[in-house]
Amino acid sequence: WQNDTPTLRIPYYRPLEPLQPGFLPGRAEQHLAGQIFSGLTRFDNNTQRPIGDLAHHWETSTDGLRWDFYLRSTLHWHNGDAVKASHLHQRLLMLLQLPALDQLFISVKRIEVTHPQCLTFFLHRPDYWLAHRLASYCSHLAHPQFPLIGTGPFRLTQFTAELVRLESHDYYHLRHPLLKAVEYWITPPLFEKDMGTSCRHPVQITIGKPEELQRVSQVSSGISLGFCYLTLRKSLRLSLWQARKVISIIHQSGLLQTLEVGENLITASHALLPGWTIPHWQVPDEVKLPKTLTLVYHLPIELHTMAERLQATLAAEGCE
């Protein structure tokens, strides 16, 4: 709690790229865009099907060439202004000027404000994925004049190289978040190998001035379970069975049991998700690994230990 405000602070390992309409390269930036901006539709968390967002519902003509999106009447921008259909229309036209979005909505012939509370899409050809496309983060709508002002559950109040702060939007049109503020503390030095940052003690957050650091007392601390995915980039240099051999080496060779880290700090998982178990393949002996592989990873120091042991194990298989 900060000033009677429930606040979540997230130490983050890299500076965040500026938010802008359309496609964003980083997953963190994509997630932030989804919290700051809203689209005409959104994906239901349970079914992953598009449902109403800025539009409470929509209708499609029998030939599939006309889509009418009916807007909610209580929409407000983060600056308090009421949302008008003309605002959304302007921003949609701006998005269609972006090459990637122009391809995403290549079926759209034109967009019109056919009623003060209705936006209508006229299509060149039927596109029954239109509601899905509009639910994507890259199709979310910012104010046409202020690209960092949206209608999402959080509004952006600070964006610097060291701190990104979001505060809840009091006039949000859907269910309000429990948190009033979220802060990304950009602290890349804490995640460098030379700092010795461990997953047991990733970061300490202290509220106050630097000269008060010696007098502060701990309020709370804890360790929560985490996970780490190993993804294998599809390439002509790495066959399916070669990829399976790498996975099998990690899970079945006893490599994890030989790591010089705390007991049970790194263990093999048996499923990616509940009910989605990792298969155990019997890799044929004739399967040989490529001569070289590149492993990319970040934080914490336990993963450096893991990477070094994996490197030595793969080297014994003829892979550097």
Say what each PLM segment does:
Residues P6-E17, H56, R66-F69, L119-T120, ...:
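Short, well-ordered beta-strand elements
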Residues Y12-T60, L93:
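N-terminal lobe/hinge region of extracytoplasmic solute-binding protein
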Residues P25, H57-A100:
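Aromatic- and charge-enriched surface segment that lines or borders ligand/interaction sites
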Residues G80, L190-V203, E308-E317:
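Short helices/loops that flank or line small-molecule/ion binding pockets
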Residues L101-Q145, P153-Q158:
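Surface-exposed binding/hinge segments that line
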Residues Y171-L213:
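Ligand-site clamp/hinge motif
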Residues I223, S235-T277:
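Periplasmic-binding protein-like
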Residues Q282-E320:
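Ligand/substrate-recognition segments at binding pockets and active sites
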